[in-house]
Each structure stands twice: as structure tokens, then as C-alpha cells.
Amino acid sequence: MDWQDLLAELEAEAEALADRQREALAADLARDERRHVGISQRLAACIASAVSVQLASGEALTGQVDAVGSDWVLISDHHREHVVLLSHVHSIKGLSAQAKVISTSRIVAFMNAHWLLVRICQQRSQVSLRLVSGELCTARIEKVGADHLDLSNHQTVLVSAIVAITRI
């Protein structure tokens, strides 16, 4: 083997090694990026798509994703709109493998479930609250506390017990 062939062979081996290292780095970066993707970002990529959400109460809601917040998702079916608190979602079918930033706006990032409950209270809408226990409470939200809601039926419900809110 002459020197030219040896150098060419070494160069080819170096290129192959560099290619493998770039591929490994790209795979590591992709895994690292996925590690930081939350369920709300995956749901944001599903806006206007159908999903089926299995709730902690044992029920499933199927419908179109209309909006997503940091800890909630708005799903509409043919008849109603449901705000589902993500902390009580067990699984989701139809979820995109893609992810999307909910919003770059600090204001939108601030719109968590508590913010949403305050807005629902201000609207004085009649709602049905699905609780973790499976119970349904139908009333208007009269007051929103730090961790609870006072309802028009003189019942107080802990926010941590709410699985979904459906406008009636």
C-alpha cells in the first residue's frame, strides 16, 4: 500500500468516525430536548385535532383540542366545552409526537387553572364540576379561593379535587 492509499484510508475512517459522532450528538440533543417537553406543549401541537382523554374520575372525554394553558386543556365535543385539569389526566389517545410552545407571551403563560377559574366565576356561568371521586357538582362558581371554590349550592370544593369543568 502506498502512502496516498494509506492517507485516503485514514481520511475515510476519520470521516466515518466524525459522521458517527455527529449522529450520536444529534440523537443526544433530540433526547435532551424531549426530556424538557411537557404534556401541555404536546397538546398545543394538537390544536383543532381530536383526542381522547382518560380522566382520574374513570371517565373519558373525546373531542377537539381548542386551547391549552400551562395546566389545563379546553376540549370541545359536539355539545359542550370541557376544561380539563392536566393534573388529573391519566392518559391521552391521539396525541401528536410533535410539541409546540403554548405561547411566547408571559401573559398567556400566566393563564393557569386558577386564572381560568376566576374568569369562569366572573362570567357567572352554570357549570358542572367532575370531581376525582366521580361526583358531579352542578352550580355557579361564586368565589375562588387560593385552593377552593365556593359554589352557588352552598358547597365548597377543593380545586385539587376538580378533574374537569363543563359549561352547561
Predicted regions and their residues:
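Short glycine-rich, low-complexity segments
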Residues: 1-62, 66-168
